[in-house]
């Protein structure tokens, strides 16, 4: 604030008045309409009214409300008395702003504009929140994928992985993260990560039986556009809206080295391949027909590839591989047998082991399901012994009175039955060691570790309603085929036609279907307590 003494030496004039006599002034800021009315004379008798309620200006018997705010730059006002003297008028420390009064139409317009601005602001806020949520979901999905592939996310701190809290060098986020999948669309399955293309997976599916486009899309997890572009090249659509493999494409089918195939699947593929080559009128010495006769060589090679060290043998959880077409099958029986020979564990037979003892034994004996959900390992003797009552063991959609007994074919096939399948765990269960043979200590560290591993796998295993409905549909479609095979085999024995060359093939297929349907039934039964099918 400027005082008298501050400018007495700067001005060549005499100053009149003192600080005590000069009143406090108030600066009034008037709107343009009010000022024009005052200058034109339409507004007269202007006075200022100050009260406890507030400050207002009276003009022509009308009151105008004002807002009092402190002056941002307080100053003094002087009046020139004559050419040689100035008189202090007062000090300005407050400013009055006259409120502008609007009519009802203008007020409504301003109100609507304010509401629109608020609405636009809220919409922008919602869009921003949604975008942030999408980026968070994408980040979480990438971290989950890296964790699944055994990689640690780049932004993981040292304290979260059990290290010291010292500062660590974090790689730059701009560096590209290598993806393990060689496929253009990473579906998360192991065959896709190994680089098996979509064409091969579609061919392997259609080689078993014609399938619909929706089924292929569900199994391969491929986009609809890629699937629609590929199908006309390898298949044709029949009158049932199903895609059927073209005859020339059967030469690209991998019959014996395709791990997800079961025994029934391979038999079906071989039959369809033979018919396709016959329709193409290929000569008997054609190179394509060599794919049908190299069975023993490829099976031996496949078993050698599946053999794993005994210390790596782990119990496998009951995974429905009918959702994943190309999931690798269980280790072969030879690996478990080698473990038996090394550790002198007695073999299990049909007399001391049965898959019907407990639900846990079902889960232990069941391996990864193949394309139709069947076990890719050999069928156990316990499965074949239950063939005399297949209709009661498996839920039947129709009557079972026409089905005869298979006890006599089972007795004749006992000498050439397939090798026994053991539970996937290398230790025999308590139910299998009933005759006082070797049994591991229940409190041993290895057994506790095995039990903890199995419990963890069971907690991690979850089934969706869509997957279980697909399996139930497959069960209903496959059961009539099993029933017809059962009747055919029974008719051979009823007619004493056991020397028929087709009998062995039909019996192998019947045993495979029996094990396959039983595995499906156990899967559906386990999931029925969690899902409403």
UniProtKB/Swiss-Prot annotation:
Chief subcellular location: nucleus
GO cellular component, one term: cytosol
Gene3D superfamilies: E3 ubiquitin-protein ligase
Coiled coil (residue ranges): 104-132
Compositionally biased spans, kind Low complexity: 163-176, 327-338, 417-434
Family annotation (InterPro entries): E3_ELL-like, WH_DNA-bd_sf
Domain of life: Eukaryota
Polar residues bias spans: 128-138, 313-326, 339-408, 435-445
Key words, A-Z: Coiled coil, Nucleus, Transcription, Transcription regulation
Subcellular localization, as worded in the UniProt entry: Nucleus
Annotated GO MF terms: transcription elongation factor activity
Basic and acidic residues bias (residue ranges): 112-126
UniProt-annotated stretches for the region Disordered: 112-193, 303-460
Gene Ontology biological process terms, A to Z: transcription elongation by RNA polymerase II
Additional notes on this entry: Deletion of ell1 renders cells sensitive to the drug 6-azauracil.
Protein family: Belongs to the ELL/occludin family.
Quaternary structure and partners: Forms a stable heterodimer with eaf1. Ell1-eaf1 complex interacts with RNA polymerase II.
Protein name from the UniProt record: RNA polymerase II elongation factor ell1
Gene expressing this chain: ell1
